[in-house]
Swiss-Prot record:
Protein EC: 1.14.19.-
InterPro entries reported in the protein's UniProt record: FAD/NAD-bd_sf, Flavin-dep_Halogenase_NPB, Flavin_halogenase
The reaction(s) this protein catalyses: melleolide F + FADH2 + chloride + O2 = 6'-chloromelleolide F + FAD + 2 H2O + H(+)
Location of region: Disordered: 444-475
Protein name in the entry: Flavin-dependent halogenase armH3
Coiled coil location: none
Binding site for chloride: 329-330
Purpose of the protein: Flavin-dependent halogenase involved in the biosynthesis of melleolides, a range of antifungal and phytotoxic polyketide derivatives composed of an orsellinic acid (OA) moiety esterified to various sesquiterpene alcohols. The halogenase catalyzes the transfer of a single chlorine atom to the melleolide backbone, resulting in a 6'-chloromelleolide product. The enzyme acts on free substrate and does not depend on carrier-protein-dependent acceptor molecules.
Biotech relevance: Melleolide sesquiterpene aryl esters are cytotoxic secondary products with anti-cancer potential. Armillaridin shows therapeutic and radiosensitizing effects on human esophageal cancer cells. Armillaridin induces autophagy-associated cell death in human chronic myelogenous leukemia as well as of hepatocellular carcinoma cells. Armillaridin can also inhibit the differentiation and activation of human macrophages and thus might have potential to be developed as a biological response modifier for inflammatory diseases.
Alphabetized SUPFAM superfamilies for the sequence: FAD/NAD(P)-binding domain
Origin species: Armillaria mellea
UniProt miscellaneous comment: Armillaria species are both devastating forest pathogens and some of the largest and oldest terrestrial organisms on Earth. They forage for hosts and achieve immense colony sizes via rhizomorphs, root-like multicellular structures of clonal dispersal.
Amino acid sequence: MEAQVPLSTDILVIGGGPAGSYAAAVLAREGFKVVLLEKDVFPRYHIGESMLPSCRPFLRFIDFEEKMKNYGFFPKPGAALKLNQDKREGYTDFTANGPDNAAWNVVRSEFDDLLLRHAAELGVHVYEGVQVEKIHFSPDESTRPVSLAWSKGDGTQGDVSFNWLVDASGRNGIMSTRYLKNRTFNKSLKNVAVWGYWTGAGRYAPGTKRENAPWFEALTDETGWAWFIPLHNGATSVGVVLAEDESKRKKAQHRAESNGKSLSEVQHDCYMADLQRAPGLIQLLGSEAKFEGKLMSAGDYSYHASEYAGSHFRIAGDAGAFIDPFFSSGIHLALTGGLSAASTIAASIRGNCTEEEACAFHSSKVETAYTRFLFVVLGIYKQIRAQETAVLYEAEEDNFDRAIDSLRPVIQGCADADENLTEAELQSTLDFCRSVLAPNQQQNNLRTPVDTGAADVKAKHAPSETDAQNPLQSMDDCKRNFGTEVINGFYVKMEQGMLGLVCA
C-alpha cells in the first residue's frame, strides 16, 4: 500500500473489489497511470464465495489464473440444485470438458486481497483506508467528472484530479446513486439474505468428481432458497435467501412466540427453522456440524442502472447492477464490467472510436450480461415459488437435467466468456427462458403469482418500441465472447498492449 495519494493521475478507480482491481490491473498492463482508492484496509470480509468457470479466462488475461490454482482454494467442479423434494437434484458440471474448467469456492477476504495485490504488482498505485467524499465535475461539461475529494481516518484529506474515472464502489454506487440517480430496483427480487459459518459439516458427493460442489435448495414452503458452500479454511458457508415480506412475516411470528428472546436470538431461530425447510442441506450438514461465530444478514435487492457510462467515466460491478446470487454470478459480472470498462477507456484514449461510441458499448455490454442472468434467475424463482408446477421440467421428468443443460451457457457464464459457445446454443437458452417466463393458462393458476420484473429492465439501442419492451431482444444477436461479441458495431480487441475496440 502506498502512502500519499497523488495530486493527479490518468485513470482513477474507486473500489478495490473484483471489478475495481480487475479494471485497474488491465489498464495498468496497457501502460496507463492508474490510481485505485479503497475505503477499507484489505483483507476485509465480504460475502459472495462461489465463482463460475467463466472467470478463468478473465483471470488468465492478467496472468492471475496460476495464482488461483496454486493458492489452495477448493476447486468448484459444478453446482447441485434441488428445486423440488420429489425430484432428484440437478447438476451443472463445470468439468465436463476437462478439470481445468472448474471454478473455485473462495474466502472472499483472501481472494479480493490476492487480486488487489496482483493489480499493485502490475503497476496500479493502491491506496487503502481512503474514503471518497465528493466528486467534482467539469465546469465546461457538467456530466464529466474531473477530480474528487478524499479523506482518511487519521484526519488527512485532499483532492486528486484525473482524466478517466472507473466507479467500482460496490453497492454504494457513488456515481449511480449520488450523482446520476439512475438506480432501479427489481420489484420481484427484493430479498433478504441471512447466513453464517459452520464447522464439521459434510460434503456433497464425497469421493466423487462432484465433491466440494456447492448445494442450492428451494425451501419446502416456497418462500426462498438456501445455500451450502464448502470453503478451504474448514468452514462451510450456509445461508438462506427469502423474499423480504416473507422474512418480515416469519420474524414477526417467531417474535410473538419467543417468550422475551432478544432480536438476535429470534433471528437465529428463524434461520434454523428455515434450514429445516431444506432437508437436503440438513443432511449435508450432518449431526457433527457446529454453528460458529455470529449470524449475518443483508438486504439482497436486485437492481440495475439506466446507463453504466458517460463522458470519461465507467461504472462496473455492484456499483451499477446486482442480481440475486442464486447462480453465483457476482464475481463474473464484476470481471465482465471491469474488462469492458478498461477496454472502452483504452479504445477512447487510442482513438479506436468516439467516446460516445465507447460509452454505448460499455452500457450495452453490462446490461446484456446482467439481463442474461436476470431472466434465468426469474425462471428459477418461478419454480421455487410454485414447486408442484412444471415450470422447469416436463410432467413425466423426475429431474431438472434438461432445464439445467438448456441454461448452461448462462449459469456457467459461457455466454460472456466462452469462445467455443455457438450462437445456436445461446439462442436455445434464450428461447428456453422465453418459454418459462411467457404467460400461459397454467401459469395463471399458480398459487403464488410471480412478477417477472421485465418492465424493470430497459432494453436500449432497440430498433422499435416493440423490441424495446422485450429485454431479451438485445441478446438475440450476441456472438460468443469478449473477443468476438459484436455490440453496436464494435468488438473488443483482446491483445495486451493494443486493448481497445475494433469496428466490425
